[in-house]
Design a protein with these regions (language model features):
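Protease-domain processing segments flanking chymotrypsin-fold serine proteases, especially trypsin-like
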Residues: 1-111, 126
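Active-site substrate-binding loop(s) of clan PA
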Residues: 148-154, 169-215
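Extracellular trypsin-like serine protease catalytic domains
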Residues: 9-11, 16-19, 82-95, 191-200, ...
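Sequence contexts marking disulfide-bonded cysteines in secreted/extracellular proteins
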Residues: 1, 25-31, 38-44, 53-59, ...
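Short, structured beta-strand segments at or near domain termini in extracellular proteins/domains
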Residues: 35-41, 163-166, 300-310
Length: 313
């Protein structure tokens, strides 16, 4: 159905139970597991917002690693997740190593950085949602079903550094522990944002098992380009419109190694809701940690169409 219409899929048998007026709102077939399904909209008027954004609003109830960051409060970022790789230890036993962050944006889908899947010969096998302590024995890991890189991403470049991870199990409901973030779709003014991750708390330091957060300020791409020379392999065109930069003017706080794939977020209040968290960027690249050089993030609003089409198609 059109991008901002809500609807359902019906089997041919279910379609016959609809009234004539309801059938008028149906068009297009798809095949799922060899079963033909018919797409029908619920109403004739489009939603006020795009489907991906409206579904996020519907899911919310009305009314930490980062250089020099602070530990996030329990359940403060229920949309935060970690991607886990299966590794074999020297003694032959297997365990899970969490190496990249991700953000839950739907019942089965998460956003992360595409470059995360090139750190080793293997792909991640599980997702740990909810911003849990990575050493927790009570947290639940969810098996990964599919990884979808942006079709224009080319490693080791920094352009189009975005991917969607789909898990096998569907979250039937959101809770205060595990919930989704909304996907930002508008231009972003220069403002304060929050970076979240499990990376190193200082350059060349050890990673943190606790979720960390830090406040940064977005800057213009023009200012950001003053800190980065064009690199034929990584930044051949400099910092472009599909990227976002953020820094700490005190040169203390920053995203660091291990934060890759984690979100850059802003929070806004809208009518009827106490607070909505939006992912505006994905941690992609930086020079050192806490050096004063801005970090580079994938600008989410530039990929809204691709995210929506990938999830709902």
């Amino acid at each position: 159905s059109p991008k901002n219409f809500k609807g359902y899929y019906y089997t041919p048998e279910g379609f016959q139970t609809l009234t004539d007026s309801q059938k008028n709102n149906c068009e297009g077939n798809c095949v799922d597991n060899n079963v033909t399904l018919i797409c029908c909209t619920i109403n004739t008027r489009p939603q006020k917002y795009r489907l991906l954004y409206q579904s996020c609003i519907d899911a919310h109830l009305p009314y930490g690693l980062v250089t020099f960051g602070v530990v996030a409060k329990p359940n403060e970022f229920p949309f935060m997740a970690a991607l886990g790789w299966r590794i074999t230890k020297e003694d032959g036993t297997e365990s899970i190593a969490y190496r990249c962050g991700a953000t839950l944006i739907g019942r089965r889908h998460l956003l992360t950085a595409a470059h995360c899947f090139y750190h080793s010969s293997d792909l991640p096998v599980v997702v740990r949602p909810g911003g849990f302590d990575l050493n927790s024995t009570t947290a639940i890991d969810y098996d990964i079903d599919q990884i979808i890189e942006h079709p224009n991403y080319i490693y080791p470049g920094l352009y189009n550094d975005i991917a969607i991870v789909r898990i096998v199990k569907v979250f039937l409901s959101y809770t205060s522990i595990v919930a989704r973030a909304c996907v930002w779709y508008k231009p972003l003014a220069e403002q304060e944002v929050t970076a979240i991750g499990y990376g190193n708390t200082q350059f060349a330091g050890t990673s943190s098992p606790l979720l960390m957060k830090t406040s940064l300020s977005t800057i213009s791409n023009e200012e950001c380009n003053q800190h980065y020379e064009q690199d034929d392999e990584v930044l051949s065109s400099g910092v472009v419109s599909t990227q976002l930069c953020a820094k700490d003017y005190e040169k203390l706080r920053d995203t660091c190694q291990g934060d890759s794939g984690g979100p850059l977020i802003v929070c806004e209040k809208i009518d009827g809701y106490s607070r909505m968290a939006y992912i505006v960027g994905i941690t992609s690249f930086g020079i050192g940690c806490g050096t004063g050089t801005p970090g580079i993030y994938t600008r989410i609003s530039e990929y809204f169409d691709w995210i929506e089409e990938t999830i709902y198609n």
